[in-house]
């Protein structure tokens, strides 16, 4: 931690910005590294309005899709109306937070699910506008998650899918109650959303509910969600630093994480992992061992 998080990363950041290095770092040679991404386990904000759907960009696609429906146009509803933060369809009781605070005398306030919307964040009118969804065709199901969004859209146009051939119709609050994998299976007519959901699923986050608040995620879940936006980019010159990403993970989830890290490397990235997990160490190209002991008791390489 001292070597990487308190020395290497701040020194690289200072070097890229043309600023003075940290006092204890005498020299650094970035080599081919051009940028640093620190993927730690800190919560994704403290705002309960941030959810898996908003952070991943899925909600933006859904809002535009709902606004394009005839039922929405008849009511004069645009994409902004489907936002639970500011839209006209949000629950008026909780203002779209999905919960209310009870003032308990002599004790801290207690947050409970909103009695009117049941935690869905939306009012009754939102349930009246329903989006047709189709089962994901094999052609889209085989997308590797690396196709660009416009390629997925072009592929969808070539698939014979009549407007009447819908497998389900759901309102926005009902969709946000689904898991990533459940919505992925029904995203055949929304290929751009399917690509985003496929990425989350490949990151081992398919069990997360779309409407789940991001501050409630575990450290490992937060790390992988932060990675979602990086998985489609070329990573030449990028350094990713992970601080003990396997903490709390099941061995199967460690395997998923290893595949994710390998994908970053295949795209040209360099990955540094601060870790004690033997599977992670065994899969590394290089192992730098510091110690014995830690802090002032260690330091030998």
What role is predicted for each listed range?
Residues 1-301:
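Conserved phosphate-binding elements of NTP-dependent enzyme cores
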């Amino acid at each position: 931690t001292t070597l990487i998080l308190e020395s290497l990363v701040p020194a690289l950041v200072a070097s890229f910005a043309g600023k003075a290095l940290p006092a204890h770092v005498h020299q650094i040679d970035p080599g081919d590294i051009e940028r640093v991404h620190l993927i730690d386990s800190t919560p994704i904000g403290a705002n309960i309005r941030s959810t898996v759907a908003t952070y991943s960009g899925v909600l933006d696609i859904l809002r535009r899709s709902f606004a394009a429906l005839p039922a929405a146009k008849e009511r004069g509803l645009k994409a902004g109306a489907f936002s639970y933060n500011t839209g006209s369809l949000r629950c008026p009781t909780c203002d779209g937070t999905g919960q209310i605070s009870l003032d308990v005398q002599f004790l801290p306030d207690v947050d409970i699910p909103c009695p009117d919307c049941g935690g869905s964040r939306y009012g009754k009118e939102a349930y009246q506008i329903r989006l047709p969804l189709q089962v994901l065709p094999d052609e889209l199901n085989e997308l590797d998650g690396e196709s660009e969004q416009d390629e997925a859209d072009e592929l969808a146009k070539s698939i014979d899918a009549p407007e009447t051939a819908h497998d389900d119709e759901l309102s926005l609050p009902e969709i946000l109650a689904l898991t990533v994998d459940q919505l992925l299976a029904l995203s055949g007519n929304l290929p751009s959303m399917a690509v985003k959901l496929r990425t989350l699923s490949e990151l081992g986050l398919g069990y997360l509910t779309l409407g789940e608040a991001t501050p409630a995620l575990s450290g490992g879940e937060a790390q992988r969600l932060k990675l979602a936006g990086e998985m489609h980019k070329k990573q030449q010159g990028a350094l990713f630093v992970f601080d003990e990403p396997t903490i709390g993970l099941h061995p199967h989830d460690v395997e998923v994480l290893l595949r994710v890290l390998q994908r970053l490397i295949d795209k040209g990235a360099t990955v540094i992992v601060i870790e004690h997990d033997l599977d992670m160490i065994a899969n590394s190209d290089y192992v730098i061992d510091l110690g014995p002991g830690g802090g002032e008791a260690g330091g030998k390489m």
